[in-house]
Amino acid sequence: MQATTNPTIPVLVLKDVAIGFDASTPLVKVPDLEVFPGEIIAIAGPSGRGKSTLLRTIAGLVRPISGSVEVCGNLLPEKAPRGSLGYIPQRLGLVRHASVRHNVDQGARAGTNIIGPTVSASLPEAWLAVRKERQDRSIRAIEEMKLTEKSREPIRRLSGGQQRRVATARTLAQRPRLILADEFLSELDEETLSSVLEAVTNYVKESNASMIVVEHDIARAKMMADKLLIIDDGRMNPFIEGTQALEVNP
């Protein structure tokens, strides 16, 4: 599935969203927010303040206390945008006994449009075209994450950093319009971090996709993001230009 090419239509729209367990004391209140194609938004702030819960809410896995979440024109969670949203959670959800390639193929299958460019072709030809495109996406994503030599290895034999690269490759193979990533750069050495960040950033910019990333390291967040949102008890952090504070219940 290809990313949208219309830069004037937001990929993500949040309106009056509050998350938490009690409507009277929400964990996080989010101002109205629109994320457009090509934008990378980082969310930073202290641990335990709702960053991951906010990401899960955008993914449609958690209902907000109030407000609405719209992804690619679909109101969540009632109408999830199948294939358009890629999610890299902290708990990666990889199939540990299966190979790197198998796990990345799962992402490619999730994003495949079986009609796509082959509308005029016969059904067997269409399926062959889809299969070839899916394989190409998997191979490319594995190469971008520098996992080619590990493609046949089972996940359980990989290091934590390598597993995070597999999860990232799985999402890139899906080719979503919106990527949600929760601390996806953790456990990576500096050299690997740089190459992973470059691959993901290139995908977002070249495909006109969008990305929301949770990152505890503010310096790293500033390095990757076009905009930085800070969860910090509703106070705007003055040394970060152009940020918008999210109101958080202490």
Description of each model-found segment:
Residues 117-150:
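Conserved ABC ATPase "signature" region
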Residues 67-83:
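Conserved ABC transporter NBD signature motif
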Residues 179-182:
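Catalytic Walker B motif of ABC-type/P-loop ATPase nucleotide-binding domains
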Residues 154-158:
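Conserved ABC ATPase signature
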Residues 59:
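Helix-to-loop junction immediately C-terminal to a conserved catalytic motif
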Residues 168:
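Hydrophobic anchor residue at the start of the ABC signature
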Residues 215-216:
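H-loop/switch region of ABC-family ATPase nucleotide-binding domains
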